[in-house]
């Protein structure tokens, strides 16, 4: 099997599996308990918290463990909206966990993006300027999970803070891609499952001084996120960030070159160069159903996606609609690389050539 859907989830690393199993079989105490077993579990949580903080240049007390990026996003946004008067400003290509909150919120501005998925900075400033009576709460994805476009976060930070706003970013896709620092960012979400950690563990960074209303009540995580800590998965996340390896993009680049050279009427969707995630290749095969292509590749043991795993289905992705792709939006396939080889890329390209030829001949 050739797995090219790493933007959806990643295979747990061996070190992660070992850490999880050790907690399940040896250090399975409740970290709130005062006895030795509980304190050993508490130490594991503390070590993982420090590892995560070190990864992004934060303080350990600024890290909240959650069940994943969706919960982290919800806590960041709802935790402020439920507490004080804010106007939510976001974009039209955000993750569904942000989009769904935005759809339910009355005081809202959605910023358009261009054909490559970049936010319109002028529109952002205009939205900030007309937010007179409430504090602006801006939520902008650091890098898009479908088309791989990376936003100019430095400019966004400067703009948001110029108008006294609070900035949240969903960094789920950028964290595995390159080293980033939270300087200037007020809140940041990400998920363990994109880093080789288990599904069901996530992080919310909250800058010291920002107070959130919990959406899950309880005494854990300094009363910011209730529920007994998921010690095994927290331990796994700690190992994942300690062993993180950033991609260089060589196999992805090779794959894109071969696809564009061997298959007519196709093109790369989204940004290029340094402004794109190094593992992402979203390709439009004009006139070909992306859903059919995903199924046909799966029959050959190749795992890809027709978009975000949170959006995948018959309806065209809101991200592809937002970048004005028209009918081409129905023909986009996302390939996201992990530790794949050029030999595997060649196999995938060979199958793509066959599928495109067959489907176009039969259309």
Give residue ranges: language-model regions.
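Pyridoxal 5′-phosphate
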Residues: 1-363
């Amino acid at each position: 099997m050739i797995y090219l859907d790493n933007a959806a989830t990643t295979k747990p690393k061996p070190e992660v599996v070992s850490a999880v199993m050790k907690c399940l079989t040896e250090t399975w105490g409740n970290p709130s308990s005062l006895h030795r077993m509980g304190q050993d579990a508490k130490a594991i949580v503390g070590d993982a918290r420090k590892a995560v903080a070190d990864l992004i240049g934060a303080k350990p007390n600024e890290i909240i463990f959650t069940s994943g990026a969706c919960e982290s996003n919800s806590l960041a946004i709802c935790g402020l909206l439920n507490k004080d008067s804010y106007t939510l400003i976001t974009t039209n290509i955000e993750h569904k966990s942000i989009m769904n909150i935005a759809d339910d919120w009355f005081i809202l501005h959605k910023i358009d993006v261009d054909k490559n998925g970049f936010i319109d900075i002028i529109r952002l400033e205009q939205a900030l300027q007309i937010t007179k009576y409430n504090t602006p709460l801006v939520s902008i994805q650091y890098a898009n999970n479908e088309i791989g476009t990376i936003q100019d976060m430095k400019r966004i930070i400067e703009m948001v803070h110029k108008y006294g706003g609070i900035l949240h970013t969903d960094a789920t896709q950028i964290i595995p891609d390159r080293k980033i620092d939270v300087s200037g960012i007020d809140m940041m979400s990400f998920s363990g499952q994109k880093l080789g950690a288990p599904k069901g563990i996530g992080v919310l960074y909250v800058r010291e001084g920002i107070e959130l209303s919990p959406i899950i009540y309880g005494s854990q995580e300094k009363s910011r996120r209730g529920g007994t800590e998921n010690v095994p998965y927290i331990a796994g996340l700690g190992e994942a960030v300690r062993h993180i390896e950033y991609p260089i993009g060589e196999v992805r680049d090779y794959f894109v070159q071969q696809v564009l050279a061997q298959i007519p009427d196709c093109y790369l969707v989204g940004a290029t160069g340094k402004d794109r995630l190094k593992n992402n290749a979203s390709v439009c095969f004009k006139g070909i159903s992306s859903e059919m292509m995903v199924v046909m590749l799966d029959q050959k043991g190749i795992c890809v996606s027709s978009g975000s795993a949170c959006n995948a289905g018959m309806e065209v992705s809101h991200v592809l609609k937002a970048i004005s792709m028209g009918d081409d939006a129905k023909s986009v396939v996302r390939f996201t690389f992990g530790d794949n080889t050029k030999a595997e890329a060649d196999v995938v390209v060979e199958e793509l050539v066959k599928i495109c030829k067959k489907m176009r001949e039969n259309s």
